[in-house]
């Protein structure tokens, strides 16, 4: 049968027995490791996501958003150039024909190294990307839309499955 002292934390035992507090904590490795484990489970109310290795899902989403902000910045700069600097607009269009924006940093680094004119375009894209991310992107709206899209998609898929498997007549079948 377990003694009551193994069920109590060492700080409580040192209050009850002054000699107990002088013992090294190393003599209770099982109690310490199980306590840490329980704390982790109790404190975390989020889902465990296995298999992402190098990055969390949030980090991967942030990377995709980062690349998307580059794409948006290129669109904004392109639209601005089209109206007031057609020559620079054509240079950017030609560069876009041969270089993908799927990796935003690689795109900007390549653009910077092309020529001094391209360097100015790249700096403008970096400036617009930062300003759009910090000032104009509607983060709350994105969160709301993401929740709505997931809920709507789940509902639609479940409805389709139920209709396929239940052989229920719908109004269109009559």
From Swiss-Prot:
SUPFAM superfamilies: RbcX-like. GO terms for cellular component: chloroplast thylakoid. Keywords: Carbon dioxide fixation, Chaperone, Chloroplast, Photosynthesis, Plastid, Transit peptide. It holds the Pfam family RbcX. One of its GO terms (molecular function) is protein folding chaperone. One of its GO terms (biological process) is ribulose bisphosphate carboxylase complex assembly. Its main location: plastid. Induction: Up-regulated by salt and desiccation. InterPro entries: Chaperonin_RbcX_sf (IPR038052), Chaperonin_RcbX (IPR003435). Residues 1-45 form a transit peptide. It is found in: Plastid, Chloroplast. Changing residue 108 to L: No effect on rbcL binding. Changing residue 133 to A: No effect on rbcL binding. Homodimer. Interacts with rbcL, atpB and THI1. Chaperone involved in RuBisCO assembly process. Belongs to the RbcX family. This is Chaperonin-like RBCX protein 1, chloroplastic. It comes from Arabidopsis thaliana.
């Amino acid at each position: 049968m377990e003694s009551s002292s193994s069920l109590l934390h060492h700080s409580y035992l040192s209050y009850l027995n002054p000699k107990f507090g002088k013992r090294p904590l190393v003599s209770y490795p099982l109690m310490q490791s199980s306590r840490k484990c329980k704390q982790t489970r109790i404190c975390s109310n989020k889902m465990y996501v296995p298999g992402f290795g190098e990055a969390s899902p949030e980090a991967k989403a942030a990377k995709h958003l980062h690349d998307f902000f580059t794409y948006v910045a290129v669109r904004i700069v392109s639209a601005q150039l089209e109206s007031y600097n057609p020559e620079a607009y054509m240079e950017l269009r030609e560069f876009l024909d041969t270089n993908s924006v799927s990796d935003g940093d690689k795109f900007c680094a390549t653009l910077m190294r092309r020529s001094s004119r391209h360097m100015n375009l790249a700096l403008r894209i970096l400036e617009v990307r930062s300003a759009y991310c910090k000032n104009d992107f509607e983060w709350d709206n994105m969160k709301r839309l993401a929740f709505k899209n997931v809920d709507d998609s789940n509902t639609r898929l479940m409805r389709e499955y139920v209709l396929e498997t239940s052989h229920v007549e719908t109004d269109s079948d009559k």
